[in-house]
Amino acid sequence: MLGLRDVCFDPMLSSYDYHPISLMSTVPNDREIVQAVVDIWRKDKATEKLGAAKLTGLVKLTHSDWQLSEKRVKTVMKAANLGLNQEKFCYAGSIMSHATPGLDMPEKVTLNIAKNRGKGLYAKKDIKKDEELWNEQAFLLVPPLEHVGIMRKGMGCAFCSRPFQSHNGVECPSCAAKWCDNQCKKKDVTHVAMWHESRHGKVTRVEWRAFEDFCVENGWMALYALGLLWLRVIRDPKKDEVQKQMMAFARVGQDERHKAVEQSNSLFASEQSEVLWKKGYEMLDKLLLDTEFSYEKDFLPGLGMFNINNVDGNMYLTQSHLNHSCEPNVDVKNVGRTQGISVRAKRDIKTGEELFTTYVNPEHQLDDRRYNLRVNWGFNCNCTRCKREEREEMEYLDELVSNWTIEHKRKEMKEEKKERTRTRTRSVHFDKEPEVVA
């Protein structure tokens, strides 16, 4: 939905007809109605939440001579792409996920799968505030795209991308790659496909570099991560388990996620996205010649999977089961590139309570949090905090409308009093001689 700064009232550019305003008119034209509503919104931003009935009432307060119905206000505002409280698109119902195979749960945590809520982690025992529930290393470690250059020059670890402070490091005898230590070297199961010319790995260095360059040029982290993930499926000694675990992550098509972007985005922008997706698919599909990899079933859901599951660009098996609350009871901290994350209790947690993290900055306001969650994770948050703040907002709006009504009535009464005074003054005449009564 358009914001106030997007509204244009130039009659040459307006999408609705403009008619000259008649001073005696009691039926407002579309432009007048839109302007009246926008004036109310500008007076107090909170009024953007008002429904058509209350908004129509406020308009008629300041334009008492207008013949205006709630239905007409709705129609006019919708035509101007300023729909009132129109339902926002959410894609949470399209997200698919499964129980993760081979997952060792932390001692005090259990995994439950509910029909209406999906996967979630719950306290199996009482948990004390600040207690560490678990720590885990990344299932998929994705180097920042800005580190690709230093990795290629041997100035950063070929696995974790950490820049070297000196020229020390474990060198590859066959290429320019270096690792922090033997631990990083051992974990780097995709190295041959990414750096060497060998064909036995099904992917060559030249093909991978072309794909990598495309990701860097377009700043496309999700595509880069998806490429790394499928290289693991091809190269990892435990590739069957890796693929099953990959498919268990919550998944949704990137095209479905894109629908949640505000209506103010143009059709042209959507078409541009689709062109880029198809080019990205072609680049990745070239790497996976002997692998079944489709645009609709693997590529688009793969992009969506990374976007809704990554934490600072990396993916974690256990952490991915945590659901969101704007008042989380656990804290997920990034310990380091190779150390992974640590999950601690923010408060005492009772047995049976669900564990919640936060997907967004809890310092943000209600509207900002909900917008971020709807666009990036597909749902409209109704956690305890959001419901409480929404109630408070509605109470404020009711009070605001009431105060505006009282204020307007006072002004009307004041004007009526002035008019009566003027009328009485005009009715007194001093130009006639008084009559003498016999």
Swiss-Prot record:
The keyword Nucleus is annotated on this UniProt entry: yes
Protein name: Histone-lysine N-methyltransferase SET5
Entry keyword set: Chromosome, Cytoplasm, Methyltransferase, Nucleus, S-adenosyl-L-methionine, Transferase
GO molecular function terms listed in the Swiss-Prot or TrEMBL record: histone H4K20 methyltransferase activity
GO biological processes: methylation; negative regulation of gene expression, epigenetic
Subcellular location: Nucleus; Chromosome; Cytoplasm
Annotated gene: SET5
Region (Disordered): 409-438
Location of the SET domain: 107-360
Keyword Cytoplasm annotated: yes
Catalyzed reactions: L-lysyl-[histone] + S-adenosyl-L-methionine = N(6)-methyl-L-lysyl-[histone] + S-adenosyl-L-homocysteine + H(+)
Source organism phylogeny: Eukaryota, Fungi, Dikarya, Ascomycota, Saccharomycotina
Gene Ontology CC: chromosome; cytoplasm; nucleus
UniProt main location, coarse: nucleus
Compositionally biased spans, kind Basic and acidic residues: 409-419, 428-438
Protein task: Histone methyltransferase that monomethylates 'Lys-5', 'Lys-8' and 'Lys-12' of histone H4 (H4K5me1, H4K8me1 and H4K12me1, respectively), thereby controlling gene expression and remodeling chromatin structures.
Pfam families assigned to the protein according to its UniProt record, in alphabetical order: SET (PF00856)
Sequence similarity: Belongs to the class V-like SAM-binding methyltransferase superfamily. Histone-lysine methyltransferase family. SET5 subfamily.
CDD domains, per database record: SET_SMYD (cd20071)
Entry EC number(s): 2.1.1.-
